Amino acid sequence: MTWRAAASTCAALLILLWALTTEGDLKVEMMAGGTQITPLNDNVTIFCNIFYSQPLNITSMGITWFWKSLTFDKEVKVFEFFGDHQEAFRPGAIVSPWRLKSGDASLRLPGIQLEEAGEYRCEVVVTPLKAQGTVQLEVVASPASRLLLDQVGMKENEDKYMCESSGFYPEAINITWEKQTQKFPHPIEISEDVITGPTIKNMDGTFNVTSCLKLNSSQEDPGTVYQCVVRHASLHTPLRSNFTLTAARHSLSETEKTDNFSIHWWPISFIGVGLVLLIVLIPWKKICNKSSSAYTPLKCILKHWNSFDTQTLKKEHLIFFCTRAWPSYQLQDGEAWPPEGSVNINTIQQLDVFCRQEGKWSEVPYVQAFFALRDNPDLCQCCRIDPALLTVTSGKSIDDNSTKSEKQTPREHSDAVPDAPILPVSPIWEPPPATTSTTPVLSSQPPTLLLPLQ
């Protein structure tokens, strides 16, 4: 009896030891480092590997995937698999049964979106054991970059180059300008005359930003290579867009300026006297009322900001769009956006169409503000906006047979972009007909699109 009791006790201990050993053999491993990064709209596979001391029988095990967003501290079930039952709570979510047999419980999610970033938890049950692991998923979007040359309103020998980066996420981005000369072939960062605007959020959650570089070509060496360098979390290497400065535009010497002045000073003097007499003949009261009360469309909107539906808009964004971004856009029907704003219905409509076609959805609400101003005659009268501007439907004359400027779509940049020439672009607007408006006349020089060579 004693021998049999001892044998039974030994067998029980062996069974208990085997059970304890088995429970410790189930383990789940996720992505190394605890963070997985994936591009926007990609078909992502979130890794989850099962390690078990025994061969896996998928008919007697279960897999459940959970997701917790970055903004809400609540888990949501994404996918579950138990025996012959599987259900996807997120469209397209799947765990391959065939791979599960070899211990691969990875979750596949097609077309991942920005809002799906967060913590994912893989829970594995092999009765009576359970193991789990978590991973942080980050969704990023790479910026698309292009260069524009904007000469509107610039002085002689001055150029403004705009580097637009769009469609990136997360918001943090770094844009710098560099130059390389024949004397100094290594890139030198430029810190002066560089203005980078605010980041603008698009409707899809991505961001846009524009950085401007102002150059005085007469003070720079021809052949100097300039680069707009974009650094972002989604890029393995910086995104570079290049252009080469050509020969500086002709600048008169002091002798030439003196000679030209001596030749033409008599006509200029007569013109000056005529202007003075004209000003004297105009009633002083009319000049006073006109100059003291008239507002440009942009200033009118800013002054009466609360009269518009601007709860989600910002004044500094409107100023940046109206004075810097919109004047560089190539609009159809020969229209160009003036930096002081416009109540010309055709100009506003063409700007609205351009922003929608180019996917600049964050700018559309700001365009609507000028529609609202035009549709408010009392406010236009209060700001003393010229009524003639409200009746103008196009900036072109009836006899203008010039062809419409074709919209140019920039080619997509690679990480390293070679030198890009400045391509000529046909004029995108003509001076408006003469009116009594006090609106300043803009330069007819259009912005030039810089396309990097592939």
From Swiss-Prot:
The keyword Iron does not apply. Residues 435-454 have a biased composition (Low complexity). The gene is NCR3LG1. Its main location: membrane. Triggers NCR3-dependent natural killer cell activation. Not detected in any normal tissue tested. Expressed at the surface of several tumor cell lines including T and B-lymphomas, myeloid leukemias, melanomas, carcinomas and large T SV40 antigen-transformed cells (at protein level). The C-terminal part is similar to retroviral Gag protein. This putative protein seems to be the result of a fusion between an Ig-like domain-containing protein and a ERV. Glycans are attached at N43, N57, N174, N208, N216, N242, N260. Residues 291-429 are annotated as: Retroviral-Gag-like. Residues 397-416 have a biased composition (Basic and acidic residues). It comes from Homo sapiens. InterPro entries: G_retro_matrix_sf (IPR036946), Ig-like_dom (IPR007110), Ig-like_dom_sf (IPR036179), Ig-like_fold (IPR013783), Ig/MHC_CS (IPR003006), Ig_C1-set (IPR003597), Ig_sub (IPR003599), Retroviral_Gag-Pol_poly (IPR050462). The chain crosses the membrane at residues 263-283. PROSITE patterns: IG_LIKE, IG_MHC. Residues 27-138 form the Ig-like V-type domain. One of its GO terms (molecular function) is receptor ligand activity. Residues 1-24 form the signal peptide. Keywords: Cell membrane, Disulfide bond, Glycoprotein, Immunoglobulin domain, Membrane, Repeat, Signal, Transmembrane, Transmembrane helix. GO terms for cellular component: plasma membrane. It is a single-pass type I membrane protein. The lineage of its organism: Eukaryota, Metazoa, Chordata, Craniata, Vertebrata. Residues 25-262 are extracellular. This is Natural cytotoxicity triggering receptor 3 ligand 1. Monomer. Interacts specifically with NCR3, but not with other natural killer cell-activating receptors, including NCR1, NCR2 and KLRK1.
